[in-house]
A protein has these predicted regions:
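C-terminal boundary/linker segments immediately following FHA domains
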Residues: 12, 54, 60-101
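Short, charged beta-strand/loop "edge" motif centered at a coil->beta-strand transition
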Residues: 14-44, 89, 94-95
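Generic structural signal for coil-to-beta-strand starts
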Residues: 46-47, 81
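Well-ordered beta-strand positions
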Residues: 11, 40-42, 49-51, 75
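Residue-level detector of conserved, well-ordered beta-strand and adjacent loop positions
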Residues: 20, 51, 61
């Protein structure tokens, strides 16, 4: 995944990766729409997941279309963009791009 000109690789054996406003998160954002521990990415049972633990939800756009989740999880596959708390067309600077292959 990449964001803010940084690239981070999440491998199958890695623990979960947190995304949010907290400085403890791997991907940190300052938007008021992003929760302190907004979402986490992890590998489980042969697939990558994004689990949303936020107030405002997470938008994911990939090869299958756009999905909105809040307080739930979704399989992340292919390539695409993740936006925290606001629709993708409102958050160009705070987007996370991903490729799973």
């Amino acid at each position: 995944m990449w964001f803010h000109d940084e690239i981070h690789e999440i491998k199958r054996g890695n623990k979960e990766v947190w995304i949010g406003r907290s400085p403890d998160c791997l991907a940190t954002f300052t938007s008021r729409f992003v929760s302190r521990q907004h979402a986490r990415l992890y590998f489980e049972d042969g697939a990558y997941y994004l689990a949303d633990d936020s107030t405002n939800g997470t938008y994911i756009q990939n090869d299958d279309g756009e999905t909105f989740i809040t307080k739930g999880k979704v399989i992340v596959k292919g390539s695409g963009v993740i936006s925290l708390g606001v629709p993708l067309d409102h958050s160009e600077s705070d987007q996370i791009h991903f490729f799973i292959g």
